[in-house]
Structure formats: C-alpha cells, structure tokens
A protein has these predicted regions:
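Conserved N-terminal beta1-alpha1 strand-loop-helix module at the mouth
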Residues: 1-66
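Glycine/small-residue-rich loop that forms an oxyanion/phosphate-binding "nest" at active or ligand-binding sites
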Residues: 43-106
Length: 109
C-alpha cells in the first residue's frame, strides 16, 4: 500500500518523460483508489495501466472486491495476478490464483 495523489503524479511524470525512448511495453499497476488518476494522466501516452488485484468472482456479495468486468468496463488493460505479496500475506492459493487468472482472461485483461 504505497502512493498518494502527489507522489503518483511525480512518478507518472518521470515515467512519461522517458516514454519516447521505450523499446518495450510498460504498464503501471496502481491501487484501486488511484486508477482514475493513472488512467487520465497516462491517456495519449504509450504507457498502459492496470490494477493490482482482481476478484475471482464475477459478481455477488463480496464487499471490497473488484471484478474483472468492472476493471475492463473502466478501461483497465492489465491486472496483477499471483503476486508474491498477495500469496504470502493473504494466503492466495494456486487455485485462487488460477481462478483470478481465468476471470481476468475472460474479461479481456
């Protein structure tokens, strides 16, 4: 859990300053509260953006979770699945990671 509007703006400015020299795809995966900032700041640049996690559930009573279709509806391109911190700190199993991967793929992420 890192970031702030001001800190994100500074980081994104530095990334955009080097965007013209990129020889690979670059994506920024931000915490949910900052997705709108990242989306608007990176619009029109070659830098893509995504979220840091996704629910394996398509819908339902999963308070605080964000589905893959919600992310895609918002214009998200990428999502991190199976990150070591989520696996270690939240106990995400291979089965949970696989379910999240399937959900992300089905939504076009």
């Amino acid at each position: 859990m890192h970031g702030s509007l001001q800190g994100n703006a500074a980081l994104l400015d530095r990334l955009m300053a080097g965007a013209a020299t990129l020889s690979c795809e670059v994506a920024v995966c931000a915490p949910y509260p900052y997705l709108a900032q990242v989306q608007s700041t990176l619009a029109g640049t070659p830098i893509l953006w995504g979220a840091q996690s996704v629910s394996e559930h398509a819908s339902g009573a999963f308070t605080g979770e964000v589905s893959a279709s919600m992310l895609r509806d918002f214009g998200c391109h990428y999502v991190l699945v199976g990150h070591s911190e989520r696996r270690q700190l939240f106990g995400e199993s291979d089965a949970a990671v696989a379910a999240k991967f399937v959900a992300a793929q089905q939504a076009g992420l």
